[in-house]
Amino acid sequence: MSTLGMMLLILLLLVPLATFADDGPTMRGHRSAKLLAHTTRDSCPSGTNCPSKICCNGNCCSKSSCRCETNQATKERVCVC
């Protein structure tokens, strides 16, 4: 096999490693810290009675389809539905 062919083969074997480097579960089955922080950032603390399970700045959002955004004027996180 030529040198160029060998380089292409090595490159093709390394592409999946670079593509999925920091998303989802790690090799031992634990989630990456970046994904966990993004997932739990807008979650309500345990024991909070919030049907939507989404809290922004301590306030329960009315629907589970809402998301938290930062209000530019007050710099507080508010529910946007």
UniProtKB/Swiss-Prot annotation:
> What residues does the annotated propeptide cover?
22-31
Subcellular localization(s) per the UniProt record:
Secreted
Please give an example of a GO cellular component term from this record. extracellular region
Asked if the record carries the keyword Disulfide bond, the reply is yes
Q: Where is it mostly found?
A: secreted
Q: Does the keyword Signal apply?
A: yes
- Alphabetic keyword roster: Disulfide bond, Neurotoxin, Secreted, Signal, Toxin
Q: In which tissues is it expressed?
A: Expressed by the venom duct.
Citing just one GO molecular function, the answer is: toxin activity
Q: Where is the signal peptide?
A: 1-21
Q: Which residues cross the membrane?
A: none
Q: How is it modified after translation?
A: Contains 5 disulfide bonds.
**Domain remarks in the entry?**
The cysteine framework is C-C-CC-CC-C-C-C-C.
The entry assigns this protein to a family as follows: Belongs to the conotoxin N superfamily.
Q: What does this protein do?
A: Probable neurotoxin.
Q: What is this protein called?
A: Conotoxin Im016
Q: Which organism is it from?
A: Conus imperialis
